[in-house]
């Protein structure tokens, strides 16, 4: 049970977090236990965590702020072991270095800074940048469907996550259908058998440029014409030029 001082201090800090949240961080206490806080870190841009959503806990001692909290990260992230106490200068691993003037915001800013670095500690793990990116992409799904505590503490984020995950799924579906329907001849035209600039003979290059301009002119003169047929014509022309050069 929290002391009156801990209760007062954590209540004040929650108000400050709501009014002025740190970048990429939100945090709130468990409604039934003010000593148990939950946080969500959004992966910053230009890091392998970009787009990731990382849920974790801060477990405060009853005599906070005179002793530091235990820090854990629950969402798989590639930087820390899941649901494991982390050895940081502001965690309960180091009560000797703890400063009672530090706050929840200070702790979580420090955690984010350590997360985006490469220093090792008790509770940290080593993974590749690509592995971290893959976990970042999966993190929203994990929090939304695999973490009961996340759903209980952050129901409004769960709703937003579901909407975003549905949007991503539809986007992937649309892209997949587009790739399946694309005319192979049109695709070949876009890939071009040969570039005009690669034609070595100056006279051949001039003739090719003139022929391409004529094709483009004919295409532009037909506003209702088929773009596919235009690309096919260009592809065949460049393919024949390539054969001629061989």
From Swiss-Prot:
Task: Look up the domain of life of the source.
Answer: Eukaryota
InterPro entries referenced in this protein's UniProt entry, alphabetically: Ub_conjugating_enzyme (IPR050113), UBQ-conjugat_E2_core (IPR000608), UBQ-conjugating_enzyme/RWD (IPR016135)
State if NADP is listed as a keyword: no
Q: Which residue ranges traverse the bilayer?
A: 225-245
The residue spans the entry assigns to the Cytoplasmic side of the membrane are as follows 1-224
Q: Which UniProt keywords apply?
A: ATP-binding, Endoplasmic reticulum, Membrane, Nucleotide-binding, Transferase, Transmembrane, Transmembrane helix, Ubl conjugation pathway
Catalytic activity, reaction form: S-ubiquitinyl-[E1 ubiquitin-activating enzyme]-L-cysteine + [E2 ubiquitin-conjugating enzyme]-L-cysteine = [E1 ubiquitin-activating enzyme]-L-cysteine + S-ubiquitinyl-[E2 ubiquitin-conjugating enzyme]-L-cysteine
Cite the UBC core domain residue spans from the record: 5-154
One GO CC annotation: endoplasmic reticulum membrane
- What's one Pfam family here? UQ_con
Question: Cellular location of this protein?
Answer: Endoplasmic reticulum membrane
Coiled coil region boundaries: none
> Which pathway?
Protein modification; protein ubiquitination
* Active-site residues, Swiss-Prot/TrEMBL: 87
Its EC number is: 2.3.2.23
State the Gene3D superfamilies in the record: Ubiquitin Conjugating Enzyme (3.10.110.10)
The free-text function statement in the UniProt record for this protein reads:
Catalyzes the covalent attachment of ubiquitin to other proteins. Functions in degradation of misfolded or regulated proteins localized in the endoplasmic reticulum (ER) lumen or membrane via the ubiquitin-proteasome system. Cognate E2 conjugating enzyme for the DOA10 ubiquitin ligase complex, which is part of the ERAD-C pathway responsible for the rapid degradation of membrane proteins with misfolded cytoplasmic domains.
Which family is this protein grouped under? Belongs to the ubiquitin-conjugating enzyme family.
By what name is this protein known?
Answer: Ubiquitin-conjugating enzyme E2 6
- Species of the source: Candida glabrata (strain ATCC 2001 / BCRC 20586 / JCM 3761 / NBRC 0622 / NRRL Y-65 / CBS 138)
Point out the gene that encodes the protein: UBC6
